[in-house]
Amino acid sequence: MEAIEIRNLTKTYGGDSIALYNVNLTLPQGKIIGLLGPNGAGKTTLIKILTGIIKNYTGEVYIKGHKVGVETKKCVSYLPDIEFIDPNWTTAYSISYYKDFFNDFDQEKALMLINRLDIPLNKKFKALSKGTREKVQLILTLSRQSDIYIFDEPIAGVDPAARDLIFDLILQNYNKSATIIISTHLIADVERILDQFIFIKKGSIVRQGNVKEVTSQKGKSIDEIFREDFRCLADF
């Protein structure tokens, strides 16, 4: 069974603004997949459909054989591109909340990662630096034992050194049989950890493939291919 199947997915806003158009994708289990495109390409809309936040669309979307809904929320761990922790919660309370809310949450793992990164347990979220707040949210997401992890722009607001740390955390601590989807416009930073990639432009899939196969065939990095593809597309 594939991790995710998408058939003829189209999403419009206001009747004439197309966010996604006729998207067809099959994503396997156990791979790290980059959803790559510029800001406004449709990445976040696609993610919000996969996570059940957006429900009004045409087409079919299946996760682990189930239509997106209550059942699929149980197997998807999602890190949005915004801060979602209550600013007055401490790190310790956030961990306790996740433990109570998610049956698959590994509290010991979360505490181990918090300790490893020297993050204070009893400070309120709003008192932490921006980079530390992002690490707390990432740790909470990774500490669920999920079949699918979805990260929406996890490195957009952090410096290059912190980006490497975030990717190392993901590589070292996710469920190895799971599918990971990382949405980003920072291609050069993410491609080293990807198995597969998807290029999305103006709501349509314009290229996808296996990272090793495509880079070997083209003799170029995914970042270079992305720049060429999107420079050509900008001419039309």
Regions found by a protein language model. Give the residues of each.
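The feature captures the beta-strand-to-loop junction immediately N-terminal to the Walker
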Residues: 36-38
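Conserved ABC transporter NBD signature motif
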Residues: 58-72
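ABC ATPase "signature
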Residues: 208-209
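Catalytic Walker B motif of ABC-type/P-loop ATPase nucleotide-binding domains
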Residues: 149-153, 158
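ABC-family P-loop ATPase nucleotide-binding domains
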Residues: 81-136
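A short, flexible loop at the N-terminus of ABC-type nucleotide-binding domains that lies
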Residues: 1-22, 29
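Helix-to-loop junction immediately C-terminal to a conserved catalytic motif
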Residues: 51
